[in-house]
């Protein structure tokens, strides 16, 4: 359930040996992406207006085949060692997240997504950021991205998909090619997972206003951090942790007046970053 960063690679891997079906309530991304209104209405959850209670923080969540990987800013940073150590400690997995096998999995994803700094078209706004870093003796580096070329970076609509197919989204990498031996059911919302004797036996889906039950052998629920807890609650799960402990990375806009015209929507959505203040 879900075709994004988690569901895409799981489906592709399992399809090598098993019959796999991917269900997603979203539609396929229209390659004609240069329309902001159309993009918000069709490629974002709640038209880009998902928010916390009281609307304190707006949450931009993808809603297309490929999930958030189809409309995100392509920033592809590896999990810091400090976080991996914390995961090992909390899960008591005996150094699993620092093991060679886990590292091999990370490298596999990096290689397939084409993560590198080669195709990061640094825009003028990022050059200004670098100037500020230099003046304040702050370290920084170019952000690795999961794109296969700089073609289309000038279009200015990277947040609404990629009409040039330069972005290596979950759909493009894991589900679109011939290595995926499964089926994709778009525009098919998951109402709940039917559980019998502690085993998932069916899923209830909605398509074109009609609800039906589909028999399943196994279910991987990868509907994103907002929708996964909702589906589990609708399915009757009572775990008190459901829907709790969501961590977000708040972003605050900074405006300034420059002598040169900036046009910040052109080029890479994010080009430079600093890690000097992490874990301090």
What does each model-found stretch correspond to?
Residues 17-18, 181, 216-217:
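Short, well-ordered alpha-helix to beta-strand connector turns
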């Amino acid at each position: 359930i879900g075709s994004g960063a988690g569901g895409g690679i799981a489906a592709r891997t399992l399809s090598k040996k098993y019959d796999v079906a991917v269900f997603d309530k979203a539609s396929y991304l229209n390659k004609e992406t240069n329309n902001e209104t159309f993009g918000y209405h069709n490629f974002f959850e709640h038209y880009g207006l998902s928010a916390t209670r009281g609307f304190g923080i707006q949450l931009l969540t993808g809603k297309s085949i490929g999930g958030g990987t189809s409309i995100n800013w392509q920033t592809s940073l590896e999990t810091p060692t400090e976080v991996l150590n914390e995961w090992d400690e909390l899960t008591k997995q005996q150094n699993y997240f620092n093991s060679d096998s886990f590292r091999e999995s990370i490298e596999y994803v990096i290689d397939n997504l084409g993560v590198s700094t080669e195709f990061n078209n640094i825009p003028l706004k990022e050059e200004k950021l670098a100037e500020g870093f230099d003046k304040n003796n702050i370290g920084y580096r170019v952000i690795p991205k999961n794109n296969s070329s700089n073609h289309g970076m000038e279009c200015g609509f990277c947040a609404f998909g990629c009409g040039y197919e330069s972005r290596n989204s979950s759909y493009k990498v894991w589900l679109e090619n011939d290595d995926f031996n499964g089926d994709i059911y778009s525009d098919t919302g998951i109402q709940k997972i039917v559980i019998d004797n502690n085993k998932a036996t069916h899923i209830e889906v909605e398509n074109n206003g009609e609800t039906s039950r589909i028999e399943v052998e196994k279910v991987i629920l990868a509907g994103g951090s907002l929708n996964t807890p909702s589906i589990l609650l609708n399915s009757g799960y009572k775990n008190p942790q459901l829907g709790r402990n969501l961590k977000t990375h708040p972003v605050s806009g900074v405006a300034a007046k420059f002598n040169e015209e900036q046009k910040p929507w052109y080029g890479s959505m994010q080009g430079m970053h600093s890690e000097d203040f992490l874990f301090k």
